[in-house]
A protein has these predicted regions:
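N-terminal cap/lid segment of alpha/beta-hydrolase-fold proteins
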Residues: 34, 38, 155-198
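Hydrolase active-site cap/lid region
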Residues: 305-351, 403, 413
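C-terminal catalytic histidine-bearing segment of alpha/beta-hydrolase fold enzymes
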Residues: 347, 390-441
Length: 706
């Protein structure tokens, strides 16, 4: 496959639709760029439209300054509003980054905040032909020789790995602390996690931001191990990774100013040990027998991103690089009228300048051949975007940039501003762990089943309506094949759709089943057994559920044969609490009261009575449950292993039903009378036809699973 060497993804995702709203609220303008991705061609008009809220007027003069590379002013002015709108415009004949700083009228104190560039101002960012930006100075002539000698010196130090197993915070994941020896009697401390059991796994190394010192969180590595990675997360400092916070607070103050240590000598720089530690961590992962022998991902943010650039530049074993707002890029930039980047070395001092050039990621970049994903913010004055572009542009392997024109540094940004790189990182990690090329377009899913219930009656070629003659799960209803309980509806009954499946629980005291058993309620259940069965894929249903304590609607998948050996996937269940739904899996050793279950609470303002899409992505090694495309739970093969056999490689069929009461509702609501799990208030609801499930559609899709 041929993969383009550069890809640009705009950081829109709703961030730029209303853009750059100040913290001031209703009377302040919003700013919308002419180009959503903030990227322009040489000589092209660069512009933003400022818009006041409807009916508002400017209470004084809004002024702005346009700065090339965030430093030199190339224009300024006052916003001139007409019909509630004003323009900021400029152009540039050469590649550059631009920062516009907007200030409010005198007396306005609630304008701007950290996420817009600082209190009392709003920053706007733009890039002009950024893929042509280069580092401000060439690398030293002996740069490669210097680092080759340091790697030889490191190779002479035995690794002496000390791995101590500890308690994991996730099922089916093994967790350990680790210590490796480094140069000058220093160490690399970290945490290691892997899927439990035998196997060989792709590796990922996480590199951290560095100030102030802090303990590493277990979940940072165990979450990756739960996805199928051999994961290592290391401290940037020569300190243990899992001590109480008080330990880090008591460290010498100089460590909090680590960027000032050894700045006058390349052989004494604090970053020498840090960079070699990252290199050693990569080599250690490659030496482990549980590494898959193919894939090593290095990833980090801010100072972690700086280290990641270096690790990928020094070590060709790195196959994938993922960085966000990386620090330290093009440290000589201030000498050339560009924004500086942390570590903010005083490069006006000749000795500091000489040292800094050996630790600048821009000088490692041409050696990076890994597939690379780089995120950067256009108004980031911690990790200056021009420097990040200058590194990105030198990477020789396939690469992708995620520009975020409205984002400052990650610790100041909003979740919405950082969402583009967070989303793309998740997509990359998912592709890599499943052996896919992250640059390859996702295969279009193939629809293997669909029913939108628009016919006049239920399509019996797809569905069988089931009847029951005995009590199961202590449920209080009998399932009957009756249009009173299950049918296709149109018009107002369909809840605004062009047709829907209606399943309704009804009061029918003294109902006798063919087997002679008595029930006071009837309801509907249908399945696709023997008509539509599939192995792996995405099963989804758009549904609207009733709120009533003890009502038990469900959308689930089941294999043919003896339960629980055949495996059960509960895509959605609810027992009457309108604020949440649950997802679960059942199999041999983890059935009934399964430990593999998760409740998910709806966002504010939503509940089960609205239309929602409930889905499961069923894969050979995992199941991902979603509500409205939002992941709510993930069950992996490794999570199942401690409880029993994985029972999810066999065909499954679809089931939709509405139970009334039963063991699960009773376990939640504690009701035993008048019916198990079903209180009197819900009995009245059923008697007044208030217990109904609507299903707009059910769909199953499949794609290439590798």
């Amino acid at each position: 496959m041929t993969v383009a060497t550069i890809g640009v993804r705009a950081g829109t995702l709703g961030v730029l639709a209303s853009l750059l709203t100040s913290a001031a609220g209703a009377q302040q303008p919003t700013f919308t760029p002419d180009h959503a991705d903030g990227i322009y061609k040489l000589g092209e008009r660069i512009g933003w439209t400022a818009t006041l809220p409807q009916g508002a007027t400017a209470k004084g003069a809004y002024t702005y300054t346009i700065r090339r590379f965030g430093v030199d002013s190339i224009g300024s002015g006052t916003l001139s509003f007409a019909n509630g709108r004003a323009r900021i415009e400029t152009s540039l004949p050469e590649p550059a980054m631009l920062v516009v700083e907007v200030k409010p009228p005198a007396g306005v104190t609630d304008f701007g905040n950290q996420s817009t560039g600082g209190k009392g101002r709003i920053r706007l960012g733009a890039a002009v032909e950024p893929t042509k930006l280069v580092a401000s100075e060439p690398k030293p002539t002996d740069f490669d020789a210097f680092w080759a000698e340091k790697l030889r010196r490191l190779a002479a130090v035995p690794v002496n790995a000390v791995v101590k197993s500890g308690e994991s915070d996730r099922p089916a994941v093994e967790w350990s602390t680790i210590r490796l020896d480094n140069i000058d009697s220093s160490h690399v401390y970290g945490q290691l996690a892997r899927p439990a059991g035998d196997g060989k796994f792709p590796a990922v190394l996480q590199l951290q931001w560095a100030s102030p010192p802090y303990p590493l969180q277990k979940s940072w590595v165990t979450s990756l191990a739960a996805e199928g990675y051999l994961a290592l997360n290391i401290e940037p400092h020569d300190v243990p990774a899992d001590m109480p916070q008080a330990f880090y607070d008591a460290l010498p103050a100089i460590i909090k100013r680590y960027n000032t240590i050894g700045t006058l000598s390349r052989d004494e720089s604090y970053f020498l040990r840090m960079y070699l530690g990252a290199y050693r961590a990569v080599e250690y992962l490659a030496s482990r027998p549980d590494w898959d022998g193919r894939t090593i991902v290095v990833m980090g943010t801010s100072m972690g991103g700086q280290q990641s650039f270096v690790a990928a530049g020094l070590n060709p074993r790195v196959t994938h690089l993922i960085v966000n707002v990386p620090a330290g890029a093009d440290v000589t930039a201030p000498l050339h009228r560009r924004w500086a980047s942390y570590p903010n070395w005083n490069v006006s001092n000749p000795r500091v300048l000489e040292t800094a050039r050996y630790f600048d990621p821009a000088n490692f970049a041409s050696h990076i051949s890994a597939r690379s994903l780089v995120g950067l913010g256009f108004i980031d004055d911690v990790s200056a975007p021009a420097g990040v572009w200058s590194v990105f542009n030198q990477i020789t392997g396939p690469k992708e940039v995620v520009p975020m024109p409205d984002s400052p540094h990650n610790h100041l940004a909003t979740a919405a501003q950082q969402r583009p790189i967070v989303k793309r990182t998740a997509e990359w990690l998912d592709a890599i762990v499943h052996g896919r090329d992250p640059f390859a377009p996702a295969p279009a899913p193939r629809v293997i089943f669909f029913d939108d219930f628009t016919g006049g009656t239920l399509d019996r070629s797809k569905w069988t309506v089931r009847t029951t003659g005995r009590t199961v799960n202590e449920e209080q209803q009998a399932y009957v094949d009756d249009t009173a309980t299950i049918r296709v509806v149109k018009g107002p009954q369909a809840g605004g759709t062009n047709g829907a499946l209606l399943i309704r629980g009804r009061s029918r005291p003294g109902h006798v089943t063919p087997e002679g058993n008595r029930f006071d309620f009837v309801s509907g259940r249908m399945d696709s057994r023997g008509k539509v069965e599939f192995t792996y894929g995405t099963a989804a249903a758009r549904m609207r559920l009733p709120a009533g304590t003890g009502l038990w609607p469900a959308f689930w998948l089941l294999g043919a044969g003896r339960w629980p050996d055949v495996g059960e996937i509960d895509v959605m269940e609810n027992v009457g609490d309108s604020s949440w739904v649950s997802a679960a899996v059942h199999g041999p050793g983890y059935s009934g009261d399964t430990p593999l279950v998760k409740r998910d609470t709806f966002p504010a303002g939503q509940d089960i009575t609205g239309w929602h899409v409930y889905a499961v992505d069923w894969r050979p090694d995992a199941m991902v449950f979603r509500v409205d495309d939002r992941e709510i739970y993930r069950v992996t093969k490794a999570m199942v292993a401690p409880y029993g056999r994985w029972a999810f490689d066999n065909p499954k069929f679809l089931i939709v039903n509405l139970a009334l009461g039963g063991g699960y509702p009773r376990g939640v609501n504690g009701t035993k009378a008048p019916y198990v799990g079903l209180p009197g208030s819900t009995v009245q609801l059923i008697q007044h036809d208030g217990a109904s499930v609507l299903v707009d559609w059910i769909r199953v899709t499949q794609e290439d699973v590798r």
